[in-house]
């Protein structure tokens, strides 16, 4: 894996004027839009034509006491996502604004060109292939963040993904540097923290860098209720990438955060990297031994990076990986024995 060159503070800030300079063309009906929205929902989308309507409807169906606006950032899709967004905009011209351009601008720039055009004091995030499941999401989260000025953002549970931390009423920076515990689709953020933004790498792990930046400015309130759904599909930028690409993107994100915080949280970020390698090492049912051999090579190649930062955790990682074939074989044997036992019971009950 090649080294990463992102260094803070050399990378600098993206200012509000630079956000406005990102290529953008807006489709909206200014005369129909509400004047003072309470929440701006930012929906980044690319090649989500088959999912976009469900995402948009989950926003429009919110039971919320204040007006809302929905900004759809369409990032030059290869499919008919833009046409689908325009069709949906005609159904709710007082709410939906579409921001697009004649070229792809990337994840970070798509996010920032929506941020700088949002008008509400609170920003909710929802990507175009996910959706909200609770019609009270905005109301409950707005009530929570308005009653806690120390919160930079609030989050909730998300269906179809593992909860990597125990439920706590509040998460702080070390919590969310160690684990990716709250999903983008559950976030509600104070816009005041986004007038400028670090020029982080344009990486699929952008939300982890966003969380790190926000949690340096406040804490994260948490509602232990499922309010959104994370859709896993082969068109997703994360799941469509091979394991080497995913590990590279994760490492780039960790290095950027480590630099941004001037190495003050290297221990927490090393713990996160070990955790990522543990998840990556899980043996698939197809290509099992090829995956295991590649895992051994990958983990050994990271010795000079991981051992000095987390020696015990790294040795435990190697130990667990080394015995994976034995554990996998025992699991297969137990499955066969269980199937054989069930077959014998079925035969016994079928005989007269």
Indicate residue ranges for each PLM-predicted region.
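Glycine-rich, basic loop-to-helix element that forms the pyrophosphate-binding segment
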Residues: 101-118, 140
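C-terminal subregions of glycosyltransferases and related glycan-biosynthesis enzymes
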Residues: 3-36, 203-205, 209-212, 216, ...
């Amino acid at each position: 894996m090649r080294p990463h060159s992102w260094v803070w503070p050399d990378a600098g800030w993206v200012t509000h004027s630079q956000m406005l300079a990102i290529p953008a063309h807006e489709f909206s009906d200014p005369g129909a839009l509400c004047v003072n929205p309470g929440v701006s929902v930012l929906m980044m989308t690319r090649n989500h034509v088959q999912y976009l309507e469900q995402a948009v409807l989950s926003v429009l169906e919110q039971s919320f006491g204040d007006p809302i606006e929905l900004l759809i950032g369409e990032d030059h899709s290869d499919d008919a996502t833009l046409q689908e967004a325009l069709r949906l905009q005609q159904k709710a011209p007082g709410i939906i604004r579409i921001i697009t351009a004649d070229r792809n601008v990337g994840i970070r720039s798509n996010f920032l060109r929506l941020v700088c055009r949002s008008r509400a004091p609170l920003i909710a995030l929802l990507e175009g292939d996910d959706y909200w499941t609770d019609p009270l999401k905005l109301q409950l989260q707005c009530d929570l963040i308005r009653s806690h000025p120390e919160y930079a953002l609030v989050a909730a549970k998300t269906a179809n993904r593992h909860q990597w931390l125990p439920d706590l009423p509040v998460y702080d920076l070390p919590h969310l540097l160690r684990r990716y515990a709250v999903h983008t689709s559950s976030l509600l953020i104070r816009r005041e923290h986004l007038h400028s933004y670090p020029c982080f790498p344009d990486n699929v792990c952008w939300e982890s860098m966003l969380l790190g930046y926000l949690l340096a400015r406040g804490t994260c309130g948490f509602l232990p209720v499922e309010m959104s759904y994370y859709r896993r599909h082969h068109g997703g930028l994360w799941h469509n990438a091979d394991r080497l690409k995913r590990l590279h993107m994760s490492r780039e994100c960790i290095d950027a955060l480590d630099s941004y915080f001037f190495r003050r949280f290297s221990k927490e970020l090393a713990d996160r990297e070990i955790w990522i390698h543990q998840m990556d090492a899980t043996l698939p049912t197809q290509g099992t031994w090829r995956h295991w051999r590649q895992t051994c090579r990958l983990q050994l190649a990271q010795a000079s990076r991981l051992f000095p930062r987390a020696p015990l955790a790294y040795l435990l990682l190697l130990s667990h990986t080394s015995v994976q074939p034995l554990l996998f074989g025992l699991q297969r044997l137990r499955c066969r024995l269980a199937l054989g036992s069930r077959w014998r019971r079925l035969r016994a009950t079928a005989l007269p």
